[in-house]
C-alpha cells in the first residue's frame, strides 16, 4: 500500500510539473508577441509626420516634407 501511495504522489507531481511548464511556454509566447506589438506602435507608418528616420517604421523620413516614406527614392 505504501509503494502505491508513493507512486501515486510521484505521478501527481510529474503531471503538475508538465502542466505548469506548458503554461509558462504559452505565457512566454504571449509576451514576445506583446513586445512586437508595442514596437510596431512606436513607429509612424508611411504618410505620417516624422521628425527623423528612427520615427518611421520604414526608417525613411523626407527631410523636405517631414513625412514618412515607404522607401528611399533617391
Curated annotation (Swiss-Prot):
Signal peptide per UniProt: 1-17
Keyword check for Signal: yes
Keywords: Amidation, Disulfide bond, Knottin, Secreted, Signal, Toxin
Source organism superkingdom: Eukaryota
Database matches in InterPro entries: Conotoxin
Pro-peptide region(s): 18-38
Record's subcellular location: Secreted
Residues with the Serine amide modification: 73
Gene Ontology CC, one term: extracellular region
Tissue-specific expression: Expressed by the venom duct.
GO MF term (any one): ion channel inhibitor activity
Pfam families in the record: Conotoxin
Disulfide pattern: 43-57, 50-61, 56-68
Domain notes: The presence of a 'disulfide through disulfide knot' structurally defines this protein as a knottin. The cysteine framework is VI/VII (C-C-CC-C-C).
Family: Belongs to the conotoxin O1 superfamily.
Protein name: Conotoxin AbVIA
Native species: Conus abbreviatus
